[in-house]
UniProtKB/Swiss-Prot annotation:
One of its GO terms (molecular function) is transmembrane transporter binding. Keywords: Glycoprotein, Membrane, Transmembrane, Transmembrane helix. Residues 159-473 form the Peptidase M60 domain. The lineage of its organism: Eukaryota, Amoebozoa, Evosea, Archamoebae, Mastigamoebida. The chain crosses the membrane at residues 7-27. It comes from the Eukaryota. Residues 648-800 form the PA14 domain. This is Antigenic protein P1. It is a single-pass membrane protein. GO terms for cellular component: plasma membrane.
């Protein structure tokens, strides 16, 4: 190596290096979630206070700042004069003939198509309230009293598509101010709910909705000739008789950020990933006046009506969930610079929902929206529909070969991606003791394979893929997905084996290569045909056979942890390992051995592989076990080790069954059972007792537990029963009879005395109850339902109740101690991070020459003869792409080879060379590069390069080079011409990093720096020193190298980096590229200092400096 590694400082250059994109994969364990202390990350050693990778960090978000606020004037816009006497609006309850519908469509269309003209001449009006003008967008009204705002919206240009900005009040005009003189090509402004284009809205009366006006949204392309007359002094005005969300759309024309000001708007419930905090959400945005809402992450956006999001409290969880969801597909399949839009609208023109893959949006029913923002539901039940539609966009359409999968690739792809989400980020498998229905089977190993081993042909294709995740991990499943693009084409398998990419043979082959297992037995279970040459190839790999056998109680497979703890009830439970293991029915010599564990309870053997287990631990504890499964399959011994964790299920209540109670009177039945012993027991996971059939015998069932409510206030409890029922509830310290149903009641009644009662209950208090059900023969049941009225007694109105069954979350086992809390589900961290993107990973280490040759510190010791006096040495270093050094081309032109020799006033260090030519045909051809050795003073050959005909030349060197003299011997023009030219020549440091940390991260000590709102910056903020020449940012790092990234500014200050109290040189903050975020400093530690803990500070010396992120490896 020439020279030595050192602290490298920074100066600036022009733009033209390709932005480096580093794909970050953060592999995390689920040890907290799995409650397995033995599961550890062996790839890292935790050092307190040392910066680490921030997997949540992204740099693709826009920003919004409120500039000013004013009170409502008190005067609403004038009402639009409408032609007819009734119109559709939210829950209007009206009916319309086809003629009425068509008339309204025509009027609606005419008015919306005239919006810009109406705004321009001052004739815009609002839809009258008496016709439902305040009740569009699924709203019960408009908050007219809300403040009117002026906001500054920062659009991050590298990401295109539509974004929600703010709320427009019905009939009011919003003024939009764009940057002076900007081009409007590629800019659109929309207003309404979801689709800005009327062609995306159903205007056929056969698809009429009584809940809304036919056209409630419209958009305007500002680049069109028909729109541009309405742009005056860079100002555009928009409004609608219905109001709506204001949207700003950009296309790929824009690469840098710009700011747009919106006046006379209201806030809307908009959640921006990694920007919107729970504090801001709950104090400002949650109840903002906008009746349309948006959740936005770098990879997707959900547009829904605000009524679905008002009850949300944890906004950060919701945006985090949706980023995690899209990031799985982004990592496994494809990544685009436009978020996928999930619209929740009433207009769905195919099936339950539809994905417009080519247009990058999905249309979902509006009644799917609430579940997308329900935290408990997403954790415990998932949300298959919207995830499925979203992942349709990840079918591989944009990658080599298109879709992958067996038989039906388009569906298989998105279902596999959704399954990974269920496995990683939900607690669905934690409820498998209650059984898993629908798509939820994908979350658990046993549930995924059980039906296949039973011989059922239920979704075998998806099960065969998902099974890999449970046995080998989601990394392996994603590797299998990637193999359809990588291994498949790299090895030309289609030609080699004469098989198709969507065949079962292809699956078996790729699965074997990825898992390093013999998959022939697995494929036989799924009844997959394997072509003979493929089968022979798998056999010759000599991998061990994979046997997909899983126990229901377990949550690991031979060391891979995939599941969740298994819930068992209070009291004794029977563990039947034979009945709860999915295993080949033809297997022989089957044995189940509890190798270790189950020490926190009483374990009693009943028979082979069957035990009674009585837990001694409480709700906040657990017990663990290791289970060995041994058997013989096809003459081969099979050994599988699975681990599991038992937790108590506090939401299972117990009931006793007293048989032969010969009375139809509840009072007599209670007397009869006083001195009797229960004949049987049962359990329920809700408030009530499910279907119980006692045949011709009468029976009395008694359930005891505790009622717990999520909110304090007034509740009306309802009972339905077959046949008789009674509820005692302890509110004041004594049981009191609350409900008494004396006859069969198949549904909840709001009028039958004794079947309902209203009580005031406090949140998180366990109210003991006793529930009696007298079944007079045959099939019986009893259920308790509820209606919540709020905290004021005056709001109680039973007639308006919408009664819901009381489910498991509102009942507790009577043995749950007062104050004991169920362990909260620990939300797993993101495993597949979205890459930190749009970085320029280089900066220039030579000075600029802005004032001609005489003032240039770089000396040209040798150059080819120049064409004319406009060709100056300094032109190659002036960061100006309109100047150059052009060799002679007239006469006989330039005689090759030619010599370029440059001398620097001091040593420069670089690992990257960048040369820019005017045109491809002007470029260097074959050349050799020499540098002067600092040790010997001799010129030494560094590189030989045959440059193809192109505008740019970029060379990367494996090690840092330090020298004060560089020479290029150019032997020809790449196009055979008799000249060459150089527009810009730069020597740079270029680095990429594995980890990235926000400049305002918790382990960064900031002194004298403030947050400056900046689109595209991490978290929406840039760290900028408050006072010129003052401020520092310090951190600890255990790395081999690190780098500092900031935003390019026309003027910048100076700083020094101090490492372990050793100050570096004072340098200027300037950049290589015109890209917004670029590297401006890097340091590589030598071998003796690498991976030691170092104290690092960036200290401002002069002017203003900014920092966005810190990269490290």
């Amino acid at each position: 190596m020439l020279g030595s590694k050192s602290i490298i400082a920074v100066v600036a250059i022009a733009s033209a290096i390709v932005t480096g994109v580093v794909v970050i994969v953060v592999v995390v364990t689920l040890s907290v979630v799995l409650t397995r202390s033995s599961v550890k990350d062996t790839n890292s050693i935790y050092v307190p206070d040392v910066i680490t990778n921030d997997p949540q960090m992204t740099n693709e978000m826009d920003t919004l700042e409120v500039i000013s606020s004013s009170k409502f004037s008190g005067t609403k816009p004038k009402e639009w004069t409408m032609k007819y006497t009734k119109y559709p609006y939210w829950r209007c309850g009206l009916t319309f003939t086809n003629e009425e519908k068509q008339n309204i469509v025509n009027e609606n269309k005419e008015y919306m198509n005239s919006l810009l003209q109406l705004i321009n001449n001052g004739s815009l009006g609002r839809m009258p309230e008496k016709y439902g003008g305040d009740k569009q967008f699924e709203a019960n009204g408009v908050n007219w009293e809300a403040d009117r705002l002026e906001v500054r919206y920062g659009l991050f240009g590298r990401v295109f598509g539509q974004r929600a900005v703010a709320w427009a009040f019905p009939g009011e005009i919003v003024t939009i101010k764009f940057p002076k003189g900007m081009s409007y090509k590629g800019i659109q402004v929309g207003i309404g709910k979801c689709n800005h284009n009327p062609s995306d809205q159903w205007l056929n009366v056969n698809n009429w909705s009584n809940d809304r006006m036919p056209i409630d949204s419209i958009g305007f392309d500002l680049g069109l000739n028909t729109t541009q007359p309405y742009i005056i002094n860079d100002t555009f005005k928009i409004g609608s008789p219905f109001g709506g969300m204001i949207y700003l759309r950009s296309d790929t024309t824009f690469t840098n950020s710009f700011y747009v000001t919106f006046s006379n708007v209201g806030r809307a419930p908009i959640i921006n990933y990694n920007i919107t905090t729970n504090e801001e959400w709950n104090s400002v945005l949650r109840n903002a006046p906008g009746n349309v809402a948006e959740i936005r992450t770098p990879g997707n956006r959900l547009v829904l009506t605000s009524r679905n999001i008002r009850s949300l409290e944890d906004a950060q969880y919701i945006s985090d969930f949706w980023l995690k969801a899209i990031s799985i597909s982004n990592y496994a399949v494809t990544l685009e610079n436009i978020p996928i839009t999930l619209n929740f609208d009433q207009r769905v023109d195919a099936g339950a929902a539809v994905a417009y893959v080519g247009r990058w949006f999905t249309q979902n029913p509006s009644d799917w929206a609430a579940a997308c923002v329900g935290k408990d539901g997403l954790i415990n039940y998932g949300n298959w529909g919207p995830l499925h539609e979203m992942n349709h966009h990840m079918q591989g359409t944009y990658l080599k070969g298109g879709n992958w999968g067996i038989s039906n690739p388009g569906e298989e792809t998105n279902n596999v991606m959704t399954s990974i989400n269920y496995i990683l980020y939900t607690n669905i498998a934690g409820h498998r003791n209650q059984g898993l229905s629908g798509w939820n089977y994908v979350s658990d190993g046993y549930s995924t394979i059980y039906k296949i081993l039973k011989g059922e042909n239920d979704q075998p294709h998806l099960r065969s893929y998902v099974n890999m995740a449970h046995a080998f991990g989601t990394d392996t499943l994603i590797a299998l997905v990637k193999s359809y693009y990588g291994l498949w084409y790299e090895n030309n398998f289609e030609s080699k084996y004469s098989i198709k990419r969507d065949s079962t043979s292809a699956f078996c082959l790729l699965a074997a290569l990825v898992t390093k297992r013999d998959t022939r037995y697995l494929c036989s279970l799924f009844k997959y045909d394997i072509q003979s040459n493929v089968s022979e190839a798998i056999k010759n790999m000599n991998y061990p056979t994979y046997y997909p056998f899983f126990n229901l109680y377990a949550m690991s497979y031979n060391g891979n942890y995939y599941g969740r703890p298994y819930k068992i009830p209070y009291g004794r439970t029977r563990l039947n390992f034979t009945a709860t293991t999915a295993i080949d029915p033809k297997a022989t010599s089957v044995s189940y051995t509890i190798k270790s564990g189950l020490t926190k309870g009483k374990l009693e053997r009943v028979e082979d592989n069957v035990y009674d287990y009585t837990p001694f631990f409480g709700i906040e504890e657990n017990d663990t076990f290791v289970l060995n499964i041994d058997c013989v399959v096809n003459g081969e011994k099979v050994h599988i080790e699975q681990e599991g964790t038992f937790e108590l299920d506090p939401h299972q209540v117990e009931y006793e069954v007293y048989k032969d109670v010969q009375t139809r009177d509840m009072a007599q039945a209670l007397n009869i059972i006083q001195n009797k012993t229960a004949n049987d027991t049962g359990r329920a996971s809700f408030f009530g007792i499910g279907t119980y059939n006692d045949g011709s015998m009468q029976s009395m069932l008694v359930e005891k537990g505790k009622l717990i409510v999520p909110k304090s206030g007034y509740y009306t409890l309802f009972m339905k029963a077959d046949d008789l029922g009674r509820l005692l509830l302890n509110i004041t310290g004594e049981y009191e009879q609350l409900l008494d149903v004396k006859t069969y009641l198949g549904g909840y009644s709001k009028t039958l005395n004794g079947s309902y009662a209203t009580v005031k209950l406090e949140k998180d208090v366990g109210y003991p109850f006793i529930l009696y059900n007298l079944n007079t023969g045959g099939q019986g049941f009893i259920r308790i339902g509820y209606c919540y009225h709020g905290t004021e007694e005056s709001s109680v109105d039973v007639s308006k109740c919408s009664v819901s069954d009381i489910g498991s979350s509102m009942v507790l086992n009577e043995k749950v101690k007062t104050g004991a809390k169920e362990p909260e589900f620990q939300i797993p961290p993101i495993k597949y991070s979205r890459p930190t993107r749009f970085l320029t990973n280089a900066y220039r280490t030579i000075p600029k020459c802005l004032n001609g040759d005489d003032a240039c510190s770089i000396k040209c010791l040798s150059l080819p003869l120049k064409h004319d006096d406009s060709s100056k040495c300094s032109n190659m270093f002036d960061d100006n792409y309109s100047t150059m050094y052009h060799s002679r081309w007239t006469g006989q032109g330039t005689t090759f080879p030619v010599n370029y020799t440059f001398e620097f006033s001091e040593n420069v260090t670089f690992n990257n060379l960048y040369v820019h030519h005017r045109r491809p045909e002007d470029s260097w051809g074959y050349f050799e590069m020499f540098v002067k050795s600092p040790e010997t003073g001799e010129m030494e050959l560094l590189e030989k390069y045959k440059h193809p005909k192109s505008t740019t030349t970029e060379l990367n060197f494996q090690k840092l080079v330090t020298t004060d003299r560089v020479q290029f011997i150019v032997y020809n023009n790449s196009n055979g011409g008799n000249y060459v030219n150089v527009v810009e020549l730069s020597f740079n440091i270029k680095e990429t990093f594995k980890n990235y940390t926000n400049s305002f991260g918790p382990k960064i000590k900031s002194t004298g720096f403030k947050k400056v709102t900046t689109p595209g910056a991490s978290g929406g903020y840039l760290a900028v020193n408050e006072k010129e020449g003052e401020g520092s940012l310090c951190f600890k790092a255990k790395v081999t190298k690190f780098g500092l990234y900031g935003y390019r500014k026309t003027t910048s200050g100076k700083f020094r980096v101090t490492i372990d109290s050793q100050p570096g040189e004072v340098t200027s903050q300037s950049y290589f590229s015109d890209s917004e975020r670029t590297l401006f400093y890097a340091h590589t530690f030598d071998e003796t200092e690498a991976n030691k803990v170092h104290n690092i500070c960036m200290e401002v010396v002069e002017g203003t400096v900014n920092l966005d992120i810190i990269g490290s490896s």
